[in-house]
Amino acid sequence: MGRSKSSSRWLNEHHSDVYVKKSKEDGFRSRASYKLIELDRQDKLLRPGMTVIDLGAAPGGWSQVVADVVGDQGKVVACDLLSMDSIAGVTFFQGDFTEDEMLDAILNEVNSRPVDLVISDMAPNMSGMKSVDIPKAMYLVELALDLACRVLKKNGCFVAKVFQGEGFDQILQESRGRFSSVNIRKPDASRARSREIYLVAKGFRG
C-alpha cells in the first residue's frame, strides 16, 4: 500500500528539517527540545533546583532540557500515553493523563512538594477534521491547566501547546484570571504550517 500524499510530505519535511538534524547532533530525542529552549530563552522559565511536571513527555525532548537545567537538586515528573526511555533525574509514568489513576500517580510523586512549572506538549491523535481535533486538544489543555492551578506554588509558571479555534479564547481568559502574565508564542522550531502555538503563563496568583 503506497504512502498518502500527506505522509510523504511529512517524511520529506522531516528529513530536510534543520531542527531534526540539529537534535541528532546535540543528542536530543526530538526537535521539540528547541521549542522549549526558545521559550525558556524568551520567558526565563527554567532554573536549577526547580520541581517540574512534564505532560505529554514522550519521546523526552522537553524532559531532557528540563532535567539538564534543574539538576540534581530539582525534580522532574513526566507522563505520556506512549513509552519513554529513561532519562536521568526524570520520574516517568506511562498512562492516560485524562484518567484519575494517572493524576493520582503524579500527585503522589510530587508529594506536596511545591511545583514551580507545569509544561504540556500534549496533543490528541489528529483526524484532520478541525471540528473534532480542536475540541479534543483544548480539553487536554484544560486538564493541564486544572493540574497547574492545583499544584503550582505562588508565582509558578504554566506552558501548554494550544491550537487556535473553539475553546481557545476561554482558555486564554481563564489563564489571565489565574496568572499575572500570559503570552502566546510561536517558536521558530514549530513547523510553519502547524496550527500549534504555545501559551506561556507566569506569576500564578495562587
Curated annotation (Swiss-Prot):
The keyword DNA-binding does not apply. GO terms for molecular function: rRNA (uridine-2'-O-)-methyltransferase activity. It catalyses: uridine(2552) in 23S rRNA + S-adenosyl-L-methionine = 2'-O-methyluridine(2552) in 23S rRNA + S-adenosyl-L-homocysteine + H(+). It is found in: Cytoplasm. Pfam families: FtsJ. S-adenosyl-L-methionine binds at residues 60, 62, 80, 96, 121. Coiled coil: none annotated. The active site is at residue 161. Specifically methylates the uridine in position 2552 of 23S rRNA at the 2'-O position of the ribose in the fully assembled 50S ribosomal subunit. Belongs to the class I-like SAM-binding methyltransferase superfamily. RNA methyltransferase RlmE family. NCBIfam families: PRK11188.1 (NF008390). This is Ribosomal RNA large subunit methyltransferase E. The lineage of its organism: Bacteria, Pseudomonadati, Pseudomonadota, Gammaproteobacteria, Oceanospirillales.
